[in-house]
């Protein structure tokens, strides 16, 4: 279990350091071949894949750390690439970290490096055994058949879109592959035609609004009289007044033409009216003394012959008629009271009646 975790960790570290999956696969395969060859030279005849994977991971980590240390030494000396001396210093630095003695601090000669002497002794004593299959150089070159080279501007015979682009660079692909093109035909803008169309739409909307207003006005006027129509209201008021006068005069004639009736029977309606009047005398006096609210009639802007504030005027359309009727009732009560008092004060006239 621990070996598998170490193996996965080694793979992740190697992949992150290389920065490319292809480079990691190539280095991992080369490390497996080298570790297998070393194990075979020592005396191992066969081995399992998990053990080989773990040893390959250790070898890759060691080489990776060696390269990082050598690069840091090169950067300290102001160089961007490391050489053999940087690698020797890195080997001794890794030896010091493991607790062994590398290059002595007293003598800075690289020839006295312990690791370097060990490597020299190993190369001189062992025989080189090549791999069963030669390793290709990295990065692996792609064959000319599988490689698709983009032709340059000169090969195609086109001129670059800008003067700053040289002719030997690869030519650009077709414009439709990298430019955004609309899927529809773009309409040519016509300012004059757009204005005419807007004006036509505006007139159409106004006509629709006018027809709707006419329908509303006709519907309301057919149901109830409109307060803005003052002539109609005045005519209704005159009709109500004439009707009330005819009713009051008819009652007087009918009361005078009665023969053989007693005083109580003749003046019973008047007495009842007087009783009602006496009970609401305070209310009547308050009505008489109440200040009159004068409404100033003014001309308003009308739309299609009707006022704009139609709803407000419809609320008070019944007020003048009810006010006239209340005044007529008060007049009738006062007349009945006056006739009753005259009859009580002059009994001679009462006998004549």
Curated annotation (Swiss-Prot):
Tell whether ATP-binding is among the UniProt keywords. no
Query: In what tissue types does this protein appear?
Result: Expressed in roots, leaves and inflorescences.
Q: Where in the cell is it found?
A: Nucleus
**Histone-fold domain location, by residue?**
30-103
Q: Classify the main location.
A: nucleus
Which Gene Ontology cellular component terms are annotated?
A: transcription factor TFIID complex
Any one Pfam family match given in the protein's UniProt record, by short name = TAF8_C
Q: How does it assemble?
A: Component of the TFIID complex. TFIID is composed of TATA binding protein (TBP) and a number of TBP-associated factors (TAFs) whose MWs range from 14-217 kDa. Can homodimerize. Interacts with TAF4B, TAF5, TAF10, TAF12, TAF12B, TAF13 and TAF14.
What the protein does comes down to: TAFs are components of the transcription factor IID (TFIID) complex that is essential for mediating regulation of RNA polymerase transcription.
Q: What is this protein called?
A: Transcription initiation factor TFIID subunit 8
